[in-house]
Curated annotation (Swiss-Prot):
Belongs to the mannitol dehydrogenase family. UxuB subfamily. It is an enzyme of class 1 (oxidoreductase). InterPro entries: 6-PGluconate_DH-like_C_sf (IPR008927), 6PGD_dom2 (IPR013328), Mannitol_DH (IPR000669), Mannitol_DH/Oxidoreductase (IPR050988), Mannitol_DH_C (IPR013118), Mannitol_DH_CS (IPR023027), Mannitol_DH_N (IPR013131), NAD(P)-bd_dom_sf (IPR036291). GO terms for biological process: mannitol metabolic process. NCBIfam families: PRK15037.1. One of its GO terms (molecular function) is oxidoreductase activity, acting on the CH-OH group of donors, NAD or NADP as acceptor. The gene is ydfI. NAD(+) binds at residues 24-35. This is Uncharacterized oxidoreductase YdfI. PANTHER family: MANNITOL DEHYDROGENASE, MANNITOL DEHYDROGENASE DSF1-RELATED. Gene3D superfamilies: N-(1-d-carboxylethyl)-l-norvaline Dehydrogenase, domain 2, NAD(P)-binding Rossmann-like Domain. It holds the Pfam family Mannitol_dh.
Length: 486
């Protein structure tokens, strides 16, 4: 073992690691999964004698994460950060860590075809589904998806790997597994089902029918702020525990998981670790996506433009704090259907979480992949307001902030490094238009983001144009101050 994590000054696994059975294959061993689903499984094993263990898999990228985990007996550290206290736990629920580039595709597929595998879960980010954010449909013409359809036995996408594993289980007479998305998308289970069945129909119609008959795709809502791991993060974890852990991750103390209780081959008793098992996740998903993620994106674009590197920096500016609070309660909350939740209290708790100085959640990180995030975080709410003839000035400002950000130059004239799967389309829209009103019209014409309806809505285009021109003329700080409400 490269690092003796079992000697760390942390909460250590008290369960026998050998008694865990690998029942879940997880695709996407990133920071969020380690700090969220991994912790729930660790709590169940520690406090409730659960024997549900994980096979962790990375398909594209993240080779070093898997290699680091393999070097330390599949153990890793999760540090919870509040303003004045850091605590750490060593998570031991991983039975094996695999990467296609290290271990080979056949090894990954063989793991997914072990008879006891009951669930395949995913955290691959929105862009990993290769679906259109505006329509939710699988992009069969995307080069990676098209390549998998042509060569389905050697897939590279997560969808292709899942369908090939299910095809092999069907051929071997093995039962299907549940496929559970844990990514930030509304009705992520429906998105997962639609991309899997669309892909399967393109490959094998009989297999597609078997999947529809035998596989479930529960929706989930996941919540925990997990900043990207930095060298500073790892140094603090080492200072806290006395052990260097390159697979370590740090997060806030808060965590939430709402799960649609729809599994074909059993599941862990996640409720014993604090998860909520419900029949309909959508109201919770919409609450989180619009109030938390929507305000996060708002702060990310407008904060970055103002020179704020971290979300907690934004919270120290009272105008940004008031604007985020107003966005949550005045423009997002009215669109929600969730019952039995005090939304004002929820908003207050979000502001407190954003203000945590230990997190240092970078605005640039949250600003990534905006084309995949705007529809569910802001644009669905805009459509609600247009239908109800109500104000959406802050939502319009958030959209304008994204447009100003993807223009690629900040208010000091410095280049912005844009990370987005639609970057070529966005850059074409920017480069083919003059700055100002024409830029807004050019970006609104991207149908994969704004659909057919919003670009043709004169009220929406007017509001976005008005706020965009204000950002150009007065800058982000002054514009946010103008629209914030105390």
């Amino acid at each position: 073992m490269g690092n003796n994590l079992l000697s760390a000054k942390a909460t250590l696994p008290v369960y026998d690691l050998n008694n865990l059975a690998p029942r879940i294959v997880h695709l996407g061993f990133g920071a969020f999964h380690r700090a969220h689903q991994g912790v729930y499984a660790d709590i169940l094993a520690t406090e409730h004698f659960s024997d549900w263990g994980y096979y962790e898999v990375n398909l594209i990228g993240g080779e070093q994460q898997i290699a680091d985990l393999q070097q330390q007996d599949n153990l890793y550290t999760v540090a919870e950060m509040s303003a004045d206290v850091w605590t750490a736990r060593v998570v031991g629920v991983v039975k094996k860590a695999l990467h296609v580039q290290i271990d080979g595709l056949e090894t990954v597929l063989a793991a997914m075809c072990e008879p006891q595998i009951a669930i395949v879960s995913l955290t691959i980010t929105e862009k990993g589904y290769f679906h259109s954010p505006a329509t939710g449909q699988l992009m069969l013409d995307h080069p990676m998806v098209a390549a998998d359809v042509q060569n389905p036995h050697q897939p590279k996408t997560a969808t292709g790997v899942i369908v090939e594993a299910l095809a092999r289980r069907k051929a071997a007479g093995l039962p299907a597994f549940t496929v559970m998305s844990c990514d930030n998308m509304p009705e992520n289970g429906h998105v997962m089902r639609d991309v899997v069945t669309s892909y399967a129909q393109a490959v094998d119609v009989k297999l597609a029918q078997w999947i529809e008959d035998n596989v479930t795709f529960p929706s989930t809502m996941v919540d925990r702020i997990v900043p990207a791991v930095t060298e500073d993060t790892l140094a603090k974890i080492e200072q806290l525990t006395g052990v260097r852990d390159p697979a370590g991750v740090a997060c806030e103390p808060f965590r939430q998981w709402v799960i649609e209780d729809n599994f074909v081959a059993g599941r862990p008793e996640w409720e014993k670790a604090g998860a909520e098992l419900v029949s309909d996740v959508l109201p919770y998903e919409e609450m989180k996506l619009r109030m938390l993620n929507g305000s996060h994106s708002f702060l990310a674009y407008l904060g970055y433009l103002a020179g704020y590197q971290h979300i907690n920096d934004c919270m120290e500016d009272e105008h940004y704090r008031y604007a985020a609070y107003g966005l949550m309660l005045q423009e997002q909350a009215p669109t929600l259907k969730v019952q039995g939740v005090d939304l004002q209290d929820y908003a207050n708790r979000l502001i407190a979480r954003y203000s945590n100085p230990a997190l240092r959640h970078r605005t640039w990180q949250i600003a990534m992949d905006g084309s995949q995030k705007l529809p569910q975080r802001m644009l669905d709410s805009v459509r609600w307001h247009l239908a109800h003839d109500s104000k959406f000035d802050l939502l319009a400002l958030g959209v304008a902030g994204w447009m100003r950000y993807v223009g690629g130059v900040d208010e000091q004239g410095n280049p912005i490094e844009i990370s987005d799967p639609l970057l070529p389309v966005i850059q074409k829209a920017v480069q083919s238009s003059a700055e100002g009103k024409a830029r807004v019209q050019s970006l609104l014409a991207i149908k994969a983001i704004f659909g057919d309806d919003l670009p043709d809505n004169s009220l929406f285009t007017a509001r976005v144009t008005e706020t965009y021109l204000s950002l150009l003329a007065h800058g982000a700080k002054a514009t946010v101050a103008k629209y914030s409400v105390k």
